[in-house]
């Protein structure tokens, strides 16, 4: 293999929990001046719109949120700022994940991230610890498609500059991502979802291929495949 493309949530960082979503809603509600339950319900109702390219920028997302909960326009800027902070807090990898990514790149492999992600994640990404550890990242909110849309896999392959058959896709399986990778001509391996048992997941499907305990096992797995 010449490249590895990783999923983000549940793979490189922990998948969010309902409790974390409620805490984020509380912090945003305090800025907007509305109830936590109102923002929490917004998150529940708008997953597709927030991830599929309908709201590609942080400003788009903040405006949509404020208007959806009948907040005043003057809080759109502060809400965008709070969303960015919340995004930054979601992008903190464990030291063992950092080491695994460094190990892959030290072997000359190209490394990328392909994530169903909303605009606050894309906005926070450039200054996150993960950004310096990979060669490229593709986020669904900016790309305008959700996994397993073939366009996402073509995009990450183009940005990695590596043919599909020389690229391994690694993910926890949300969004039918592993079958999408196989359909794109990539090899694929599942990792057990990073996070707690109640972590949020979307679009899980059955997977009968190889499964690793965590991304930390990817470097030795690739060595074993040679």
Residues covered by each model-derived region:
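Asp-based, Mg2+/Mn2+-dependent phosphohydrolase catalytic module
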Residues: 1-4, 14-18, 30-31, 76, ...
């Amino acid at each position: 293999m010449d490249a590895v493309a990783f999923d983000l949530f549940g793979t490189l960082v922990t998948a969010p929990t309902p409790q974390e979503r409620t805490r984020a809603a509380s912090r945003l509600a305090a800025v907007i001046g509305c109830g936590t339950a109102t923002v929490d319900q917004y998150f529940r109702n708008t997953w597709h719109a927030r991830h599929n390219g309908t709201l590609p920028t942080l400003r788009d997302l903040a405006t949509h949120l404020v208007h959806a909960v009948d907040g005043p326009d003057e809080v759109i800027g502060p809400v965008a700022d709070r969303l960015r902070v919340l995004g930054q807090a979601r992008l903190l990898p464990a030291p063992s994940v950092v080491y695994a990514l460094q190990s892959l790149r030290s072997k000359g492999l190209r490394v990328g991230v392909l994530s169903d992600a909303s605009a606050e994640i894309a906005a926070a990404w450039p200054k996150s610890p993960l950004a310096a550890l990979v060669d490229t990242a593709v986020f669904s909110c900016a790309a305008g498609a959700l996994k397993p849309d073939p366009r996402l896999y073509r995009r990450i392959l183009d940005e990695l500059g590596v043919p599909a058959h020389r690229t391994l896709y690694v993910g926890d399986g949300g969004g039918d991502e592993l079958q999408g990778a196989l359909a794109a001509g990539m090899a694929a391996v599942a990792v057990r979802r990073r996070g707690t048992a109640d972590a949020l997941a979307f679009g899980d499907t059955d997977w009968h291929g190889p499964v690793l305990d965590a991304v930390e096992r990817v470097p030795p797995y690739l060595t074993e495949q040679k």
